[in-house]
């Protein structure tokens, strides 16, 4: 073992021993830091400031059929536990809707300040299809904040931030809502090229920082993974373009936008042979001296034996399978030799009229620009609307997702110190418990689970963009549509809307054994079989010749 490897192993061992000793000495203590909002989930849900939603989710047609039946618990982690006594908010129910929220005693106003959002996620059973993001709920003094027992996916939010994974979706969301000052309408702004989340069973720390200079930064596990501008890196952009194409402007009929035209003066050269072949026989080629023309490329397998159950009367004459001729392995080739083909130097193909620059070409046409009547300019989108609370509203296929150590404030240095007290203490303990093995995330095993997961992936994508969901997973959309029509047809048939069933007529059929026709053997194959002493029935014979693979 090399000296540096010995040192590395010794260092790793020291870290593991230190982590184990740290776990023995460390117990959970609430932080002494103060910020606009800090949550460490010390109390059980009934005794805490958090309220589980009792609302129902509405379908697009207004039916209330999906309720938030997912259970929540405040408990210590079961997988790779960290600090003894440290609890978190755990999403407990698989394949269910969950919603829980809390309101601030005073709204948080980000105007003119930095905003820092930080929390931990522990995916104790991995993440098949679902999210682990949080929403900062919009303070609505005029309408009231629909949170608490009334909290739903329709509750307005100011910022949505956190990991999401399902099918092709695998990203850390950063979405903020912006109000159009002209129309008063709200529009979601989605981060372009978002980073990928950490899908592990140990704790991951997610941090979002926005600044008054309109910059932002996303950190995962205290490492920067994405930086950018609120004005430039979101879709759709905060500010619309100053100018737009004039919808009343049309391309003139005389506008020429064809850059090239055919040369009408060109004629086909007299020596242009359109019928010359592309490939010709190489007349200079010579047959290799070791080429065995009398030897076939394949021969009957000498090791093949007719199966004991083979019946010549029923199955036809048995013919052994063909194998490559071993005599041809170390020579240039076997069988009839033909000269190879080469490219014809006189080949020109079909003659076409050459193209020349168009003297009337004016270039590509574009409509003239006019002032955008919907233009406005907001140079400070970081002045988000006031935040009145925090909500977690998720639908996931994987249970036991743990949330802990939420921080919402204005001081990035304070958030980092909070992480040093919490995340950076538990992480080495978890890694020591995890050992040197990589996380083994559970995968769906049965066909039913796999189909169910595909359906959930489609529905998850549809919650953000139904058109994109159909585009990415057309087979699932078609399957769901077929299932709906099948169910509708069954219901109509059940109630007699399709008509009476036709009278069944008993039919008698006579079973006959089909005899497969025999394909005639090729000349080379006939030659090989003849050399092997295999008799080939003459045309018109009632027996069928059947090959068998080697048993």
Swiss-Prot record:
Q: What happens when the gene is disrupted?
A: Leads to a slight growth defect at 30 degrees Celsius and marked defect at 37 degrees Celsius. Leads to abnormal cell morphology of enlarged cells with collapsed cell walls and increased chitin within the cell walls, as well as strong growth defects at both 30 and 37 degrees Celsius when both DNJ1 and CNE1 are deleted.
| Signal sequence, renumbered to the chain | 1-23
Q: What is an example of a GO molecular function annotated in this UniProt entry?
A: calcium ion binding
User: Which Gene Ontology CC terms are recorded?
Assistant: endoplasmic reticulum membrane
Q: Where in the cell is it found?
A: Endoplasmic reticulum membrane
Task: Please give a single GO biological process term from the UniProt record.
Answer: ERAD pathway
What InterPro entries would the database entry show? Answer: Calret/calnex, Calret/calnex_CS, Calreticulin/calnexin_P_dom_sf, ConA-like_dom_sf
Cytoplasmic-side positions: 499-551
Side of membrane Lumenal, spans: 24-477
As for membrane topology, the entry says: Single-pass membrane protein
Q: What is its main location?
A: endoplasmic reticulum
Q: Does the keyword Membrane apply?
A: yes
For this chain, the family text in UniProt reads: Belongs to the calreticulin family.
Stated role: Endoplasmic reticulum (ER) chaperone that functions to stabilize non-native glycoproteins and retain them in the ER until they are properly folded or targeted for ER associated degradation (ERAD). With co-chaperone DNJ1, coordinately maintains ER homeostasis and contributes to maintenance of cell wall architecture.
In Swiss-Prot or TrEMBL terms, this protein is called Calnexin
Species annotation: Cryptococcus neoformans var. grubii serotype A (strain H99 / ATCC 208821 / CBS 10515 / FGSC 9487)
Gene for this chain: CNE1
